[in-house]
Amino acid sequence: FEEQIMMEADRLRNPSYYPEGSDYLAEYIRNHKLAEYLELIKESKKICTIPVIASINCYTDAEWVDFAKQIEEAGADALEINILALQSDIQYKYGSFEQRHIDILSHIKKTIRIPVIMKLGSNFTNPVALIDQLYANGAAAVVLFNRFYQPDIDVEKMEHTSGDVFSNASDLSTTLRWIGISSSLVSKIDYAASGGIHKPDGI
């Protein structure tokens, strides 16, 4: 997760340090976390007989294009891009979040040759139009849908707490509905369902 890596690096920044030292520490944390993930891919390839699909959760296209290349070199058979971000800016420009998906995909496709899969959220006004544009820009497949972290409040302690971590079976109907709609209109791209699959019947 891009935000987790960046948050940990920022957390270790100390204003009392020299700026160069603080930047070095942040860069070390980032590189260490990414190296751990690349090693996981390499080890998985040694023991798995099925394709290994790597996944990165990001919301910018700055450094993740380079990381995608490293993932390919580590042996991943495909790469899933999960662009998960809560849009709450009052100055938000309509359509800019959809365009960010297309821009990140386009940049990554120029760097790697393995298939790129885009995982989408369920809060788009018109997922079909976005899927069509993703296919036009080289996406091999889409996954519907990703899921926001669900915060909650403990009313007894009046503290923030985590909400339900897992999906529930009722989530599947929305996913299947949109896969049905989208696949009938944009049929040349592959689809995968995510969330709400709790028993064999869902598969």
Language-model-detected regions and their locations in the chain:
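Short glycine/proline- and acidic residue-enriched helix-loop micro-motifs
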Residues: 19-28
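Alpha/beta enzyme core
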Residues: 4-16, 32-42, 46-53, 57-194, ...
